From Swiss-Prot:
One of its GO terms (molecular function) is nucleic acid binding. It is found in: Cytoplasm. NCBIfam families: xseA (TIGR00237). PANTHER family: EXODEOXYRIBONUCLEASE 7 LARGE SUBUNIT. The lineage of its organism: Bacteria, Pseudomonadati, Campylobacterota, Epsilonproteobacteria, Campylobacterales. This is Exodeoxyribonuclease 7 large subunit. CDD domains: ExoVII_LU_OBF. Belongs to the XseA family. Keywords: Cytoplasm, Exonuclease, Hydrolase, Nuclease. It comes from Helicobacter pylori (strain ATCC 700392 / 26695). InterPro entries: Exonuc_VII_L, Exonuc_VII_lsu_C, OB-fold_nuc-bd_dom. Bidirectionally degrades single-stranded DNA into large acid-insoluble oligonucleotides, which are then degraded further into small acid-soluble oligonucleotides. Gene3D superfamilies: 2.40.50.1010.
Length: 420
């Protein structure tokens, strides 16, 4: 048996292993994952409960992965055994990697969803509100598609006042993602201008999952999320649920359904307006009746106040005339009394003069009583005792008195007198 050097034996092992294990599929758990920042190569180990084997995924193959390779993942790698002669190491040179039990596209989509969820792409507080009465809507679709024809037909029936603008876009196949992104950005560029769109609708009819999968792309999700214009995703059928549906401000199950959700029904609004008109007429009629009644009440109150004010002024004038008459009468009586006092005592004792004096005193008392009545307030009463006017200060407990005004007389008894 020939003696071999270390290099020779490693070289023979390399030739044997690489020829024997040219293509292998190996299942295991990813561990010790390292991605080289400069080269982009990924180095990791694949292990099960008993063994470990080293693996390498070079940059070119890594870029073709549909999902992100992570520590602890259960995967199936496809590749070939390679031996590094200087160290006698062997490893699997991975050409493809798929997650165990689920497809790589499915895993990639779930990973992307989680990434976007953490960035807030699905949060309701980041969604823009649906416009109530859209005037101008951008539809991102193929201008020759059945979806566009259906959308125009429904829009013309529901809300013909709305202008529907088709932005012709490639909706499947190679170049679809870039075309959709460019159309979204273009439509949104009119934001805050006189030609701004009230809504952007990304729409296409049904198809295979391969046809629709472009709308799970992160670039389309970014374009929808960053748009300042309200957006809708209307891709495929009710059963098709794509990433664009989660990111857009609103999802419609089909392109036709998008028009039914976005555009109000002119027939329904005409019925509503008729109802509003009836309610408005009733409310106005009721309000007019209330205001009319209130006005009539105010007019009546004004007339009553005017009459009372006029009556009060006349009463004041009469009061002034009565006071003037009283003063003149008192002045005359004083003059007569003074004149009589000048007559001698003997003359006063004469029956004739005595009679005249008594009559004069009666007249004076009557005048005082009339004076008290004249000074009676509008809402007051004359106080008298034994048919003689009496001041309040002269009253005492137990006195029987009479209260009177122009319309009423009443009797009363003094229960107590408080001096102020």
């Amino acid at each position: 048996m020939d003696v071999l050097s270390v290099s020779e034996i490693n070289a023979q092992i390399k030739a044997l292993l690489e020829a024997t294990f040219l293509q292998v599929r190996v299942q295991g758990e990813v561990s010790n994952l390292t991605i080289h920042k400069v080269s982009g190569h990924a180095y990791f180990s694949l292990k099960d409960s008993q063994s470990v084997i080293k693996c390498v995924l070079f940059k070119g193959n890594a870029n073709r992965l549909k999902f992100a390779l992570k520590e602890g993942q259960e995967v199936v790698v496809f590749g070939g055994i390679s031996v590094y002669v200087p160290r006698g190491d062997y490893q699997i040179n991975c050409f493809e990697i798929e997650p165990k039990d689920i497809g790589s596209l499915t895993l990639a989509l779930e990973q992307l969803k989680e990434k976007l969820r953490l960035k807030g792409y699905f949060d309701e507080e980041n969604k823009l509100p649906k416009p109530h009465f859209p005037k101008r809507v951008a539809v991102i679709t193929s201008q020759n598609s059945a979806a566009w024809a259906d959308m125009k037909k429904i829009a013309s029936k529901r809300w013909p006042m709305c202008e529907l603008v088709c932005i012709n876009t490639l909706m499947q196949g190679e170049g679809c993602v870039q075309s959709v992104v460019e159309s979204i950005v273009y439509a949104d560029s009119f934001h805050d201008t006189k030609n701004a769109f009230d809504a952007i609708v990304v729409a296409r009819g049904g198809g295979s999952m391969e046809d629709l999968y472009s709308f799970n792309d992160e670039k389309i999700a970014d374009a929808l999320y960053l748009a300042k214009t309200f957006s809708m995703s209307a891709i495929g059928h009710e059963s098709d649920f794509l990433l664009s549906d989660l990111v857009a401000d609103l999802r419609a199950s089909t392109p036709s359904n998008a028009m039914e959700i976005l555009l109000p029904s002119s027939d329904e609004w005409l019925q509503r307006l008729d109802g509003f008109n009836v309610k408005l007429h009733r409310s106005f009629k009721t309000l007019l009746h209330q205001k009319k009644a209130h006005l009539e009440h105010l007019v009546a109150s004004l007339k009553r106040l005017s009459f009372e004010n006029k009556h009060h002024l006349n009463a004041l004038k009469l009061e002034k005339l009565k006071i003037a008459l009283e003063n003149k009468t008192l002045e005359f009586l004083r003059f007569k009394k003074t004149l009589l006092e000048k007559i001698s005592t003997q003359t006063l004792t004469s029956p004739f003069l005595q009679t005249k004096t008594e009559r004069l005193n009666r007249l004076e008392n009557a005048l005082k009583l009339a004076h008290a009545n004249l000074k009676l307030p509008q809402f007051g009463a004359l106080v008298s005792k034994n048919n003689q006017a009496i001041e309040l200060e002269a009253l005492k407990r137990g006195d029987k008195i009479e209260l009177s005004n122009e319309k009423t007389r009443a009797s009363a008894e003094i229960l107590s007198v408080d001096r102020v």
